[in-house]
């Protein structure tokens, strides 16, 4: 897309444009259009589970296991799990399960059998079926560990993972060192990630299943690359406003554009049992429209607002690059200040008919005292009255929010706010 400008000195009309250096987003709904179909996973369906189990155990122990063997093993040990949905289960027009009829994990996928290298039969049939109680938990847990970036957090995850394995059976073994990295490559295999997503999607639906704790490792697949959606949900919670009222506090076009894209209809964002939360690992999208990368203005504005209203979680959010910091910061401060200066406290129950009646506020035309209500129209009128100038009290409000924070992450929202307001 290009626009035209006129050069005064030469009299030329110049078409101006920017390089198209970003891939377009892909919405999950597009995967199912025009034909509603399940995502396809390619798996070598082994016939000898006993031999496969031994290969996988030994391969995980020495780091030589292939992701193809992992996929085959997971399929073999999980395919017979059955649960009955309490209602018909559909997503994007795809029928996944019928009410009160048994269904399995792999009913969420179209499974294609593929040929592959035969397993070496050199006397490796040494493991017992009891391993199937804990090996899948270990495998999925290693996927979660592979996505962690901080060393100490990885160590904590490994400790908790082995605890989960022990809960499955006391015979679980600690066969992977906390410094191992061979499993990091599994995330690059689309068949493996589809299995991860299907397992999490299945047990998110059947939360009471005896096998549901396996989600310790798979849960990171849900809403992967959807940080901006998480920001929206978090902002709604910490402000205490209905979601539609949060939208009325959007004053920046870049934030508006991000939200319009995220709210593209027909994507099943608000359907808990949809394929949508697994758009990345299911292969529905290669570029999420809900990531912080694709929605940097909204993500920054939302996280800074949340931080200023004392959200502990928001302090570690990373600050995006190349956004309109000044405008977004001003808008976030105004929103947070309005939330911090006002409340929606009122009597909710009465006894013996004794109800407090609030007198209507009467503001003078030249009154520059901040409003005591959360009506965005009233606040914008006040903002006009003070000539769009950040007041000393607004600065003090932001400074108090910054001063309460201890350790601060580099390039985080908290670091940005401290440099600006402290």
Curated annotation (Swiss-Prot):
InterPro entries xrefs: Rhabdo_ncapsid, Rhabdovirus_ncapsid_C, Rhabdovirus_ncapsid_N, Rhabdovirus_nucleoprotein-like
GO MF annotations, alphabetized: RNA binding
Positions of region (Interaction with the phosphoprotein (N0-P)): 1-180
Gene3D superfamilies: Nucleoprotein, Rhabdovirus nucleocapsid protein like domain
Consequence when changing residue 364 to D: In strain: Isolate CIN0309R, Isolate CIN0318R, Isolate CIN0327R and Isolate CIN0327M, Isolate CIN0360R and Isolate CIN0360V
Superkingdom, natural source: Viruses
Chief location bin: virion
Statement: the UniProt record of this protein carries the keyword Zinc-finger: no
Binding site for RNA: 320-422
Function: Encapsidates the genome in a ratio of one N per nine ribonucleotides, protecting it from nucleases. The encapsidated genomic RNA is termed the NC and serves as template for transcription and replication. The nucleocapsid is bullet-shaped with the tip containing 8 turns of a conical spiral before reaching the helical cylindrical trunk. Nucleocapsid assembly is concomitant with replication, therefore viral replication depends on the intracellular concentration of free N, termed N(0). All replicative products are resistant to nucleases.
Record text on subunit structure and interactions: Homomultimerizes to form the nucleocapsid. Binds to viral genomic RNA; this interaction contributes to the virion assembly. N in the nucleocapsid interacts (via C-terminus) with the P protein (via C-terminus); this interaction allows to package the L polymerase in the virion and positions the polymerase on the template, since P acts as a bridge between N and L. N(0) interacts with the P protein; this interaction prevents the uncontrolled aggregation of N(0). Interacts with the matrix protein (inner layer); this interaction contributes to the virion assembly. Interacts with the L polymerase.
Family: Belongs to the vesiculovirus nucleocapsid protein family.
Protein name: Nucleoprotein
Organism of provenance: Chandipura virus (strain I653514)
Lineage of producing organism: Viruses, Riboviria, Orthornavirae, Negarnaviricota, Haploviricotina
Gene it is expressed from: N
């Amino acid at each position: 897309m290009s626009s035209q400008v006129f050069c005064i000195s030469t009299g030329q009309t110049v078409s101006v444009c920017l390089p198209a250096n970003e891939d377009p987003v892909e919405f999950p709904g597009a995967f199912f259009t025009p034909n509603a179909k399940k995502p396809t996973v390619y798996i070598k369906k082994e016939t000898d589970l006993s031999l496969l189990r031994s290969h996988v155990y030994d391969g995980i122990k020495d780091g030589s296991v292939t992701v193809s063997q992992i996929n085959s093993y997971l399929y073999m040990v999980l395919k017979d799990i059955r649960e009955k949905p309490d209602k018909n289960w559909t997503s994007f027009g795809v029928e996944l399960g019928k009410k009160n009829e048994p269904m399995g994990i792999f009913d969420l996928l179209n499974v294609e059998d593929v040929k592959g290298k035969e397993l070496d039969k050199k006397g490796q049939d040494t493991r017992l079926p009891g391993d199937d109680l804990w090996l899948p938990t270990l495998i999925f847990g290693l996927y979660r560990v592979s996505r962690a970036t901080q060393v100490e957090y990885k160590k904590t995850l490994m400790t908790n993972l082995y605890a989960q394995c022990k809960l499955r059976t006391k015979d679980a073994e600690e066969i992977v060192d906390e410094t191992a990295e061979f499993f990091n490559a599994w995330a690059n295999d689309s068949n493996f990630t589809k299995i991860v997503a299907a397992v999490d999607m299945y047990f998110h639906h059947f939360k009471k299943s005896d096998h549901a704790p396996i989600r310790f490792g798979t849960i990171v697949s849900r809403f992967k690359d959807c940080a901006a959606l998480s920001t929206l949900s978090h902002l709604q919670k910490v402000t205490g406003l209905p979601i539609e009222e949060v939208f009325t506090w959007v004053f920046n076009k870049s934030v508006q554009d991000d939200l319009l894209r995220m709210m593209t209809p027909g994507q099943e964002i608000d359907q808990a049992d949809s394929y949508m939360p697994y758009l990345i690992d299911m292969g529905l999208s290669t570029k999420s429209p809900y990531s912080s990368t694709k929605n940097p203005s909204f993500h920054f504005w939302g996280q800074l607002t949340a931080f200023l209203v004392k959200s502990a979680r928001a302090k570690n959010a990373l600050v995006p690059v190349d956004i309109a910091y000044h405008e977004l910061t001003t808008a976030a401060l105004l929103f947070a200040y309005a939330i911090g200066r006002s409340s929606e406290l009122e009597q909710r129950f009465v006894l013996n008919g004794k109800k407090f009646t609030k007198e209507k506020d009467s503001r003078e035309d030249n009154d520059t005292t901040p409003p005591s209500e959360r009506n965005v129209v009233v606040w914008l009128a006040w903002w006009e009255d003070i000539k769009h100038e950040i007041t000393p009290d607004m600065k003090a409000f932001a400074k108090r929010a910054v001063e309460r924070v201890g350790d601060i992450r580099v390039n985080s929202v908290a670091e940005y706010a401290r440099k600006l307001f402290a």
